[in-house]
Amino acid sequence: MPWKAIGIFDSGVGGLTVLKEIIKALPQEDTIYFGDTARVPYGTKSPETVTRYSLEIASFLVHRDIKLLVVACNTASACALEALQQTLSIPVVGVIEPGARRAAAVTRSGRVGVIGTEGTIRSSAYAKAIKRINPEVEVVTRACPLFVPLAEEGWTDNEVAHLTARTYLSGLREAGVDTLVLGCTHYPLLKRVIGETIGEEVKLVDSAEETARIVAEILRGGELLRPTSEQGNHHYFVSDVPAGFIRVGNRFLGGKLGDVYQVSLEAEKE
């Protein structure tokens, strides 16, 4: 079991920021990443559809003999995590709970901000998770949809990025939050401009970092860490042509992706 890979999936490239943190925390581990590029974005789909997609991808990854599954997608974490945990016999980790736990732990004023896509904010998934941990925390949310194309275009520190950040984050500054959750896997690429805009006194919680920390804890606690000092191998699969995934993915991962293979989930089921 320890020699098996970690499976990770997202609707596209955003989950590569989670993979990047997992590689940083657990460099010896093998990983298998699936980006559902044929059906991105998930935020516009119904919860039932997102759950069906997630179960299909989980089946694909489980057949490749993984030891743990990371749902590196906020929408899928909000809609499908429970179904995945009930269906699979391996640990399943989403990105919402780790970020929520960290935010509830570090806030001093009891006022936490959450930014994310329109779908994630509309689901109230982070607010509900934070409230479950500490009902006294006040959660202020803001959808920041333009951050996604900015991250994918690499416009992460120019005037457009700064203007967009000021527009989105001014209300959170006025609300007096002392902690801000980056509730989208694209947003770590904009961490610098977000931090400068919201102010250094506000603690940024990166859900990708927190998810990697939880994954490490689970593997260590279950004696599932790969017992070697050698660097792990990383494999990439997508459901549509990989050219765009590779172009943007190199930036998200902070290095060059290896080979990326296009697969048909329908064919896999046959």
Curated annotation (Swiss-Prot):
The active site is at residues 73, 184. One of its GO terms (biological process) is cell wall organization. Keywords: Cell shape, Cell wall biogenesis/degradation, Isomerase, Peptidoglycan synthesis. Its EC number is 5.1.1.3. Substrate binds at residues 10-11, 42-43, 74-75, 185-186. One of its GO terms (molecular function) is glutamate racemase activity. Pathway: Cell wall biogenesis; peptidoglycan biosynthesis. InterPro entries: Asp/Glu/hydantoin_racemase, Asp/Glu_race, Asp/Glu_racemase_AS_1, Asp/Glu_racemase_AS_2, Glu_race. It catalyses: L-glutamate = D-glutamate. The keyword S-adenosyl-L-methionine does not apply. Belongs to the aspartate/glutamate racemases family. Provides the (R)-glutamate required for cell wall biosynthesis. This is Glutamate racemase. The gene is murI.
